[in-house]
């Protein structure tokens, strides 16, 4: 397996620079032997997927140096941009040396099912893969209402095993790792999981008409509703519910040959 001792890890997230989950992840990654640098959005950027949006002023995108709790000596930056923008910028001349891997999280809430497409945590890891780096998205299954004291250590406990798994594969590999929010002693064995067809909750959007004299056509209000279907026991949703940390390899955008089925297309005149 590849040695982690010479590798540089960029730690980011979509919950923002002030998330304790980010700090725990950076600390655990440093303990695993990586050269760590932290760069995360200056405020919450959940649900932005692989967006490369950034707030651009006259002089560019603002970067604020930060000192993070328990991370003395680790360079850290709050960036006024989305997680994938941070990853993209890191490979385009901002960070030297460039990262070898991007570790994104620890997200407050699981990233499961096909809805991982919309996760900023996962988007950062997928963007790393597109640049030929290793990518790892780390999430904690805290349920609908996050607890006051999440078990971040439940996610960090399995990181050495997941890092070994990741680094045994080719650069460009992206893994999504979810852990139940339990005491680490209660964790069951790590399992490979398929993506569920749905997550643990479904977003329902309601259109509310504007009142008399309103300047808009109304508002769209979204809310979460529990999914009634039972997940497959081999899916990420099912395995997490059974107390297993899960790992899933993700693939990003790629062309699929054969769309024309061998039909010869001639130019139209």
Which role does the model predict for each range below?
Residues 129-154:
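Glycine-rich phosphate/pyrophosphate-binding loops
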Residues 15, 44, 82-83, 107-110, ...:
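Short glycine-rich anion-binding loops that position phosphate/pyrophosphate groups of nucleotides
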Residues 110-119:
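Glycine/threonine-rich flexible loop motifs
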Residues 12, 39-41, 104-107, 137-139, ...:
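Short beta-strand segments
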Residues 48, 150-269:
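Electrostatically charged, flexible surface regions
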Residues 101:
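Short, Asp-centered acidic motifs that coordinate Mg2+ and/or phosphate
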Residues 2-9, 19, 23-93, 97-98:
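A cross-family phosphate/adenosyl-ligand binding-site feature
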Residues 90-96, 123-134:
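Alpha-helix C-terminal capping segments
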């Amino acid at each position: 397996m590849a040695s982690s001792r010479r590798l540089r890890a960029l730690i980011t997230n979509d919950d923002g620079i002030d998330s304790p989950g980010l700090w725990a992840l950076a600390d655990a990654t440093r303990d695993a032997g990586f050269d760590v640098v932290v760069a995360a959005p200056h405020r919450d950027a959940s649900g932005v997927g692989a967006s490369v949006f950034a707030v651009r002023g006259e002089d560019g995108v603002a970067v604020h140096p930060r000192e993070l709790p328990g991370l003395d000596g680790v360079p850290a930056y709050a960036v006024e941009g989305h997680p994938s923008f941070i990853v993209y910028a890191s490979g385009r001349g901002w960070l030297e040396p460039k990262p070898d891997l991007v570790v994104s999280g620890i997200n407050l809430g699981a990233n499961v099912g096909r809805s991982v497409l919309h996760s900023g945590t996962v988007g950062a890891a997928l963007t790393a893969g597109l640049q030929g780096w290793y990518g790892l998205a780390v999430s904690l299954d805290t349920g609908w209402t996050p607890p006051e004291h999440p078990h971040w250590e439940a996610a960090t406990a399995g990181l050495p095993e997941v890092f070994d798994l990741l680094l045994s594969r080719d650069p460009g590999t992206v893994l999504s790792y979810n852990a139940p929010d339990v005491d680490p002693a209660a964790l069951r064995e790590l399992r490979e999981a398929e993506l569920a067809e749905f997550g643990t909750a479904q977003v329902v959007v309601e259109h509310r008409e504007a009142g008399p004299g309103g300047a808009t056509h109304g508002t769209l209000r979204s809310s979460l509703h529990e999914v009634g279907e039972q997940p497959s026991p081999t899916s990420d949703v099912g395995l997490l519910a059974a107390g297993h940390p899960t790992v899933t390899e993700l693939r990003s955008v790629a062309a699929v040959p054969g769309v024309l089925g061998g039909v010869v297309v001639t130019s139209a005149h």
